[in-house]
Amino acid sequence: MMNNIHLDKILILDFGSQYTQLIARRVREIGVYCELFPYDVDSEFIKKLNPKGIILSGGPDTVTLDNAAKAPSIIFDLNIPILGICYGMQTMAIQLGGRATSANKHEYGFAKVRVRNHSPLLSDISDEGHGLLDVWMSHGIEVEQLPNGFKLIASTDNCNIAGFANVEKHYYGLQFHPEVTHTKQGERILERFISGICQCEKNWTTDNIIAKLVQNLKDQIGNANILLGLSGGVDSLVVAVLLQQAVGKQLTCVFVDNGLLRFNEGNEVMQIFAQNMDMKVIRANAHKKFYDALLNENEPEAKRKIIGRAFIEVFEEEAKKLDNIQFLAQGTIYPDVIESADAKYGKAKLIKSHHNVGGLPNDLQFKLVEPLKELFKDEVRKISVKLSIPPHIIYRHPFPGPGLGVRILGQVKQEYANILRQADAIFMDELHKNNLYDTVNQAFAVFLPIKSVGITGDERRYDYVIALRAVETIDFMTARWARLPYDFLDLVSNRIMNEISRISRVVYDVSGKPPATIEWE
C-alpha cells in the first residue's frame, strides 16, 4: 500500500528571510512534506491546508514598528504546534502579549546558546555536553518580556531570551537559525519539532514520491496522448521517464531547436535519447520563429513571455500531426513556481517569470501536466538516481528553458547568439579540461550588448563584452559565487578574446543569490 506523501505536512510562512527556502529543504530532508507561502496568505486557505505544524520564518522587517508584518491570527486558534525562528519568534511574542525591543548588542554570526530549563524542543541537545549550542544569529531586535504561559529555554551572553516555549500549547521560539549549517545541532532541533512535537510521519521519501507521481500521471492522463516539451536537462528527463512508466507509448517528446541552444546541444540531446531512452522524440527546427518573435524586444519579462508563447505554438503545430494529444507536460520545479509568484502562492512578490510558469499564454490548448512542481532541484536529482538516469545527465549543469534568450541582455540577435555560443563552449571546455566542471553547480557565459575599448596588436578595437558566471548551490534558491582559480579565469578570458573576433573584454560575476539571481535576466 502506497503511503500518502502529503498526509502530514508542515506549513512555512515566509516573512522574507534569505533562509526560508533552507527551512523547507531541511523539513523535507527529515522526511516530511512542507509548503512555503507568504506570511499574509489567506486564513481560510491555511485551515484548508490542514498542516500538522507551522514554522514562522525570519525576515528583514523591524517587528516593533506599527506596520510590521504579522502572522495570521488564525494560526493561534488551530491548536497545532508553532515554531517561530528569529523574526518569527519576535512576532509570535508580540502577538501573544509579550514585548520586543532593540537589542543592546546586535548579534550577527556565530554565537553560543545556553539551553535553560526543560523543554521538549531542546532538552538533551548540546554541542559540548554542557548545555551549550553553537548557533547562527542574525538579529538587532530581541524579546524582552515573555507572553503569559511561556518560559525561557535558551539564552546567550548578549540575548537574555534566545528561546522560549509554551509547552502546553506546543509553541516555541528560537532567536537563532536552526536551518543553516552553521547551527551544528539545527537538524536535530528541527527533527525534534517536526517528528516529536508535531508527530509527523516520515512519508516524504524518494520511493514514495516516485510511486505517487506515477500513479497521479496514470490517473490524470488516462487513455489520452501527451506531449512533453523536452530540453535535455535533468528535470524534463525525469518527467520523460515518469511518463514512460505511467503511460508508455501515449507519450511523444518534442525537442524544440529554437536557435537559442548551447553549442551542438541539439545533436547532443538527440544522441542522449537515442542511446539511453526508448521513447519517441521529435526534433522541431524553429530558429526563424523564435528570432522573428524576439525581434526588437529588450525587456526581460517580455522576452520570457514571447519565448513561452513560441514554445506553445511549436507544440500546437506538432500536436496537429498526432492523434488525441490532450496534455502538455513540462519539467517545472518548485523554485520556478516560487520565483514566478504563481497565483497559488497568494501575495508573493514576483522575482521573475519562468517561461513555463508566468510565460504561458492564457489560451493554452492543452491541459498542463507538471509532475515536479512541488520538488526542489536536489529532490529531482535524487529521483533521477532512483530512475537509473545516467550520471553524466543527472549532474549536467542546468540550462534555462528560454536558453540563450535570457543570457543575451536586451535584444536577441542571431549574431549575438553565435558569439555567446562560442564563448560558452570555451568556458565549458576549460572547466572540463581543468577538472572544475563538477566543483560548481552551474556555469555559463552571458553576452553584454555594450562595447568596450580593447587593443589588438597596435590597433584599437571596440567590441562586445562577455561575462562569466559560476555558482555553488544545493537547491538553486540560494547560491554562492564560485571561487575559481585566477589562472583558470585568465586562461578562459584569453581564449575567448583571442578566438572570438567580436569580444574585447571578459568579466567575472561575483554576485551571490540573494541579492542577485543566478541568471542575469
From Swiss-Prot:
Q: Pathway listed for it?
A: Purine metabolism; GMP biosynthesis; GMP from XMP (L-Gln route): step 1/1
* Protein keywords: ATP-binding, Glutamine amidotransferase, GMP biosynthesis, Ligase, Nucleotide-binding, Purine biosynthesis
Which GO cellular component terms, listed alphabetically, does the Swiss-Prot or TrEMBL entry include? cytosol
- Active site (UniProt): 86, 177, 179
The GO terms this record gives for MF are: ATP binding; GMP synthase activity
Class in the EC hierarchy, top level: ligase
Name the EC number(s): 6.3.5.2
Give the matching PROSITE patterns.
Answer: GATASE_TYPE_1, GMPS_ATP_PPASE
Gene3D superfamilies on file: 3.30.300.10, 3.40.50.880, HUPs
Which Pfam families does this chain map to?
A: GATase, GMP_synt_C, NAD_synthase
Which residues are noted in the entry as ATP-binding? 231-237
Question: For this UniProt entry, which segments traverse the membrane?
Answer: none
Question: Where do the Glutamine amidotransferase type-1 domain residues begin and end?
Answer: 9-203
Give the reaction(s) catalysed.
XMP + L-glutamine + ATP + H2O = GMP + L-glutamate + AMP + diphosphate + 2 H(+)
The GMPS ATP-PPase domain is annotated at: 204-396
Name the domain of life: Bacteria
In terms of HAMAP family, this protein maps to: GMP_synthase
| The protein's assembly and partners | Homodimer.
- Please give the function described in this protein's UniProt entry: Catalyzes the synthesis of GMP from XMP.
Protein's UniProt name: GMP synthase [glutamine-hydrolyzing]
Q: Which organism is it from?
A: Ruthia magnifica subsp. Calyptogena magnifica
